[in-house]
Amino acid sequence: MRFTRSILHQYAQETVRQRERTEPDLHAAYLVGSLLDPEPLLGGTTDIDVILVHKYQAPVERETLAITPEVSLDLFHRTRNDYEQHRQFRRDPWMGYPLTFNHILLFDTDHWLEFIQASVSAEFHRVDNVLARVNTLSSTARASWFTLIQNTTLPHQEWLRNYLEILSLAAIAIAGLIGAPLTTRRFLVTVKVSCE
């Protein structure tokens, strides 16, 4: 079977419909990750990332289900309380960006998620919010760098792994000046274009 963005979106919608029937406290669901890209497949593989928001309690933090060897379904469970300070998501590079996209809603009780989306999207690209998102990432990279150069006892492989993670965070911060943070799967494909 040849997967298209539309077919992957249908899988996500069907999963949420099934969860509506089996999880009565499901409050909202939306897409994140590679399905927000025009080309979600990378090398013929992808994952369908869905955030399920529960009214009171999330049954687990995360579930991963294989649809085929090439496609997996990642379900992240959150509660409504996680969204109480939703305006702060304007300054959060990981939570904020997905909420600014159109066509991500899979399920929404009483237009709750639409309201959250509108609140996050308003002034999301204002300079102070962009800089706050970038500073979060660059400060972490900088602190990690100073920790790394002071630690002379690390084995070479661990030092190198930490060094590459720091470079990754720095590149993600630079890319954040003009757009969404780079993801692990597409990092090498998109880092050059994003940082130019």
Regions found by a protein language model. Give the residues of each.
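Metal-dependent nucleotidyltransferase catalytic core
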Residues: 1-27, 32-101
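Weak global preference for isoleucine
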Residues: 7, 35, 48-53, 67, ...
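Short, functional N-terminal and low-complexity linear motifs
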Residues: 17-19, 83, 106-112, 157-159, ...
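A sequence-composition feature that detects small, non-aromatic residues
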Residues: 12, 28-29, 58, 66, ...
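Internal, well-ordered alpha/beta segment that forms a basic, Gly-enriched binding/recognition surface
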Residues: 80-145
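Conserved nucleotidyltransferase catalytic core and NTase-mimicking acidic/glycine-rich helix/loop elements
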Residues: 129-196
